[in-house]
């Protein structure tokens, strides 16, 4: 797996109020790197140096500690990585295929596994 990874891509934080979340992180020095609507969810990627936060409004946020939804690892050759992870039998797959979203300039492809503490680890490739 290590040969496919290039670093942390983003940390996903759901929100009930995306504007309030953006204002908070802007006060910390973050800038809006990308903003869009995906279905009914508003999505914003907020950047501070090499740290990227993906926040998305879903109106189901529990508003309690442990609010981070997932950690995304930046990868290359996602289809090959997916096959390797699935065939290993070591990991609990949360996705049965590589998915796509129309984010950024050319979209992204991703899939998610479950960590030993029920954390979600997303492997994501910007296209």
What are these regions (language model features)?
Residues 1-19, 68-71, 124-127:
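N-terminal beta-strand motif that seeds the catalytic metal site of vicinal oxygen chelate
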């Amino acid at each position: 797996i290590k040969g496919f990874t290039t670093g942390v891509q983003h940390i996903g934080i759901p929100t009930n109020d995306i504007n309030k979340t953006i204002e908070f992180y802007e006060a910390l020095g973050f800038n809006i790197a990308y903003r869009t609507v995906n279905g009914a969810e508003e999505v914003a990627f907020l950047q501070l140096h090499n740290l990227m936060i993906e926040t998305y409004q879903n109106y189901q946020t529990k508003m309690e500690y442990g609010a981070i939804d997932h950690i995304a690892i930046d990868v290359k050759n996602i289809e090959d990585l997916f096959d390797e992870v699935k065939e290993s039998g070591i990991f609990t797959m949360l996705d049965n295929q590589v998915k796509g979203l129309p984010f950024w300039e050319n979209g992204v492809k991703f899939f998610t596994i479950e960590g030993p503490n029920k954390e979600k680890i997303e492997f994501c490739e910007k296209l």
